[in-house]
Amino acid sequence: MWRMRGGATRRGSCCGGDGAADGRGPGRSGRARGGGSPSGGGGGVGWRGRADGARQQLEERFADLAASHLEAIRARDEWDRQNARLRQENARLRLENRRLKRENRSLFRQALRLPGEGGNGTPAEARRVPEEASTNRRARDSGREDEPGSPRALRARLEKLEAMYRRALLQLHLEQRGPRPSGDKEEQPLQEPDSGLRSRDSEPSGPWL
């Protein structure tokens, strides 16, 4: 009895499943057939046709990006060339600067060691100028010794004035002491300054101021 019920149950479920499948089948097939043309027209364009405009835009953008990339590459290459050229120029200028410094040092040392045989003769001239100045100064000093305002003339005049001052003091002292009968002793002191004055006057002296 249980076997009969189980068989009937299996048969009923199978029949019901077939009916449901039959009920669902036409609807799906209808939707599948009608989905191709949702607008109702039979000659519509598919998704591949609708993507043509976007593809063209992508191609244009890709071309622009490629051109920009090439321009950037050219600018970088130009910058690299300029940088290399500037580096070479900098290295050349450094070498030139070092060479000039060495030449300057060598010339300076040569001028210090051999002042008379220098390249331009500047050290020899620099040493010759003070010597000429000292020689001229000595010549001027020797020539001015005989002038009225020279130290030699002033010294001679000072000595002459000192001798006259001593004579005046001696004469004043004798006058204060009074006259004496023996004039030999008085004349002897008076002659001493005269002899000194004459010896000093014999030297060349300048005129009076």
Curated annotation (Swiss-Prot):
It comes from Homo sapiens (Human). Residues 125-149, 174-188 have a biased composition (Basic and acidic residues). The gene is TUSC1. Residues 1-55, 111-157, 172-209 are annotated as: Disordered. Residues 14-47 have a biased composition (Gly residues). Widely expressed at low level. Expressed at higher level in testis, weakly expressed in muscle, colon, lung and spleen. Not detected in 3 non small cell lung carcinoma (NSCLC) cell lines with homozygous deletion of the 9p region, while it is down-regulated in 3 other tumor cell lines. InterPro entries: CCDC89-like (IPR043450). Keywords: Coiled coil, Phosphoprotein. The modification Phosphoserine is found at residue 150. Residues 70-114, 152-177 form a coiled coil. This is Tumor suppressor candidate gene 1 protein.
